[in-house]
Swiss-Prot record:
Its main location: host cell. It is found in: Host membrane. Plays a role in virus cell tropism, and may be required for efficient virus replication in macrophages. The keyword DNA repair does not apply. Belongs to the asfivirus MGF 110 family. The chain crosses the membrane at residues 1-19, 128-148, 163-183. Keywords: Glycoprotein, Host membrane, Membrane, Transmembrane, Transmembrane helix. GO terms for cellular component: host cell membrane; membrane. It holds the Pfam family v110. This is Protein MGF 110-9L.
Amino acid sequence: MKVIVLLLVLAVMQPVIQSQPFPGTGELPMTRRPPKKELEYWCTYAKSCDFCWNCRHGVCKNKVFEKHPLIKKNDYIQICRVSRYNERCSYFTDTRIRRFHIMSCTNPTYYDWFDELMQVKEDRVIDTENIKHTCLCMIATIALIGYIRKQYSRMQLQAATRLLIFLGLYVLLGILMTNIIMNLPLSTDNPMQMRRPPERDLKFWCTYAKHCDFCWTCKDGMCKNKVFSDHPIITQNDYIVNCTVSRWHDRCMYEAHFRIHYQHNMNCSQPKDLEWFIELKRHVINQDDL
């Protein structure tokens, strides 16, 4: 009970503690936006943070670097918090997936947390050997569960111990089944591989998977849409994500490859435009900070 009370007190005090300045020289409390005089510093090393951008009608201009190209308002721009304590400067993204970076204030290093978050392999091929291994493990698990159930009456164990054993086995079985389902063949021409779409299918995929890299041609940091010529040119950033696609009968699927893989399945003849990237990175913006 004492531990629970202590945790509740800490939870209540946390906002108060965060709002207080850090002790020492040159302190900056954990705040959503740095002072204007420090914008050039922070926007050099935290380029994706929202306090570096002025957005209007879906187009964003960099507050600090006038020569920076205009970009479309998208999820490359993240809500950030910054702080400074003596020679330690830090910033992190205030999203569901929080990314923290601490650096020396006098000798900072540029760290693209978003780039690392989105780091992926160029192609993903389903490993058939892994599927075989998973199936064997599932069969062995089912056999083990059957054996334990048969010996249930002979086991001289407490009821709680028996329950934990069965729960553990069923969780393992569930994990194995999920692994198999996620590796089911989905492509008719090459059922064991997700791949880039052919040129003739680009218009379809780029309508419903707008962020996928196969929809864009990038050169010197500027990206042009391959399909829709009237789409504005955007700067090359992590709004564009590596993707692979697959089609099986009337089931179409595309997958975004980053550390948290996201898959979207849809009816090929009646597809649904799903902004998976926006849903994943959705966050609440404090209107007072706009």
